[in-house]
């Protein structure tokens, strides 16, 4: 459970990562986008993205994606910092759940309220299938979706 706790703490402490999608233009190639996110109560990443963005077009063709979140470290300590790869499927948040997603997202990114209602923007959510967590040298491994969702980000272990 230590890795699950670490992954949840890391994802909760940061608000941007690299969203990796499968390129719709170049089949078989990954496409990474620096993307702000927030978490819902289950630790699922929420995104506010435009239909014009390449990553949104990629998700429409293939919803499987990864979100890489890492600690901000100096060049000397880059590999010793924690990082997590959240793997899952990304889809637009259903209308009935949009108010809760909006509230969670705008709490972390209040400036996004300026464009949240533009016609080409919508809230998306990743349903996490599995997480690969690296807590530094010697602490790494896969975390199940249920362990990740059940971990308390405020807990120290």
Predicted region positions:
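An N-terminal domain-cap segment
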Residues: 1-60, 68
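A generic local secondary-structure boundary/capping motif
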Residues: 8, 112-115
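Short secondary-structure junctions and interdomain/linker hinges
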Residues: 14-18, 111-113, 133
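Short, surface-exposed beta-edge/turn micro-motifs
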Residues: 16, 43-45, 62-65, 118-121, ...
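Conserved hydrophobic/aromatic beta-strand scaffold that supports enzyme active sites
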Residues: 18, 32-36, 85-87, 123-125, ...
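Solvent-exposed residues in well-ordered beta-strands and their adjoining turns
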Residues: 40, 50, 91-93, 127-129
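Short, structured beta-strand-loop surface elements
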Residues: 54-108, 118-121
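C-terminal edge-of-domain segments
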Residues: 114-157
